[in-house]
Amino acid sequence: MHIGSLTIVSETADIVTVLFSGERRVHDFEKIEEQWEFWPATTQRCRSLGIRRVLVLNELEGEISSTYVRDFHTNLGKFGFDREIRYAMVVREPRARAILSLGIALASADGWDIGIFSEVSAAQEWLAQPLP
């Protein structure tokens, strides 16, 4: 599945891998629209396959809005995320990772099983831990 800069790039027996690539959308409404389309379909795909782990490779380029990050990550359920799924995001670019870490921390504090990493191997190791 591919919507804008968001693509499911692989599925294994227990992990769906998602790639965010290209230029970051400039306007928050563009980002929100893309997320509203992508995540409900991805969540449904995971449910239909019995998959409870998602690896997100965030390779977006460009400016990142801390306001958007905060608003998005405090409303994950409204965007189609599922609390029964564990999400690991890999962001190699330090500035983007620092800003996204705020959103991930807020979501985690709200009970979401979500983490952020600088390397794929660390994210995969975390995803492999037993689910609650």
Which residues are covered by each model-predicted region?
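Amphipathic, Lys/Arg-enriched alpha-helical "gate/interface" segment within cytosolic domains
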Residues: 2-132
